[in-house]
């Protein structure tokens, strides 16, 4: 799933023509950057759950401790 160079050049022209403030990073023309495969996401605000986290959620009781504190997790 690669992008054609013509698409990238059009995107760079749009970005460079719209950047008028000095706070924005300059557009790097004809440079290939080594970007790692790891994507770091900010923490989710309290009270919001992502669908992938619903199955592995451990709910705390009113004392703030896990209901299974005394047991060893067999999957660990």
Curated annotation (Swiss-Prot):
UniProt entry tagged with the keyword Phosphoprotein: yes
Pfam hit, one: DUF4597
Keywords: Phosphoprotein
Signal sequence extent: none
Modified residues (Phosphothreonine): 44, 46
Chain segments carrying region Required for interaction with PPP3CA: 36-41
Misc. comment: May act as a prognostic marker of median survival time in pancreatic cancer patients.
Known partners and oligomeric status: Interacts (via PxIxIT motif, when phosphorylated on Thr-44) with PPP3CA.
Protein name: Uncharacterized protein C16orf74
Organism: Homo sapiens (Human)
Gene behind the chain: C16orf74
């Amino acid at each position: 799933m690669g992008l054609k160079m013509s698409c990238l050049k059009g995107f760079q022209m749009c970005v460079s023509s719209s950047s008028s403030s000095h706070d924005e990073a300059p557009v790097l023309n004809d440079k290939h950057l080594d970007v790692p495969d790891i994507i770091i996401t900010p923490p989710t605000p309290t009270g919001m759950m992502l669908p992938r986290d619903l199955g592995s959620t451990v709910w705390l009781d009113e004392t703030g401790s896990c209901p299974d504190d005394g047991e060893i997790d067999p999957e660990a």
